[in-house]
Design a protein with these regions (language model features):
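Conserved SAM-binding loop
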Residues: 66-73, 78-186
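Conserved Class I S-adenosyl-L-methionine
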Residues: 188-194
Length: 194
């Protein structure tokens, strides 16, 4: 779902949104992010579907009038935050579609894996080991914020969504995706896929 930001809320000091147990679990798997047959194989298979949805949702967001957008780079001129980027499975394709991507993750190991892979394929992505609330407190702003398969790992949902709102420029788009709230989705998505 993409939401347009219509008001400006000043960043404020927030409780941590980071769940240390989840961070430890993903950190332990960080060397496997780009192994298409490894523990993140379901995410690799799902990425083309997610990217089609992300492209369709973000490509019509407002951007600088001088930005030339062609079909191969429909996200050109957009500064996009990929919050909870993991190993960069969405950051890389968004960059290839023309976005200026900042990928953020609470796991330093995930950021190291993302940086190594991006360097290996010649992509320039600004990866950071930080949190949404820290970026909001620093008054960072983005045309779009993508939080895909992240909110189920957040310790304080209210603080997280407030931080995401603060990170959006006026008229920006917030896109969040998560699993259905069913037992089957929980088992297949959170435990089997991640």
């Amino acid at each position: 779902m993409v939401q347009q930001r219509t008001n400006e809320t000043p960043a404020s000091k927030r409780a941590s949104t980071i769940d240390p147990v989840d961070v430890a679990q993903f950190s332990a798997l960080s060397e496997h992010w780009w192994d298409e047959a490894g523990p993140f194989a379901p995410l690799h298979r799902f990425t083309p579907v997610r990217m089609g949805f992300i492209r369709d949702c973000l490509q019509d967001l407002p951007r600088a009038p001088a930005t030339e957008v062609d079909r191969s780079r429909p996200l050109a001129g957009l500064r996009v935050l990929d919050i909870g980027c993991g190993g960069g499975l969405l950051s890389e394709p968004m960059t290839r579609l023309g976005a200026d991507v900042v990928g953020v993750d609470a796991s330093g190991e995930n950021i190291e894996a993302a940086c190594a892979h991006a360097d290996g394929v010649g992509l320039s992505i600004d990866y950071r080991h930080t949190s949404a609330e820290t970026l909001a407190e620093a008054s960072e702003q983005f045309d779009a914020v993508v939080a895909s398969e992240v909110i189920e790992h957040v310790a304080d949902l209210d603080a997280f969504t407030a931080a995401l709102s603060d990170l959006l420029r006026p008229g920006g788009g917030l896109l969040t995706t998560t699993l259905n709230r069913t037992l089957r989705s929980l088992i297949l998505g959170k435990f089997a896929a991640e």
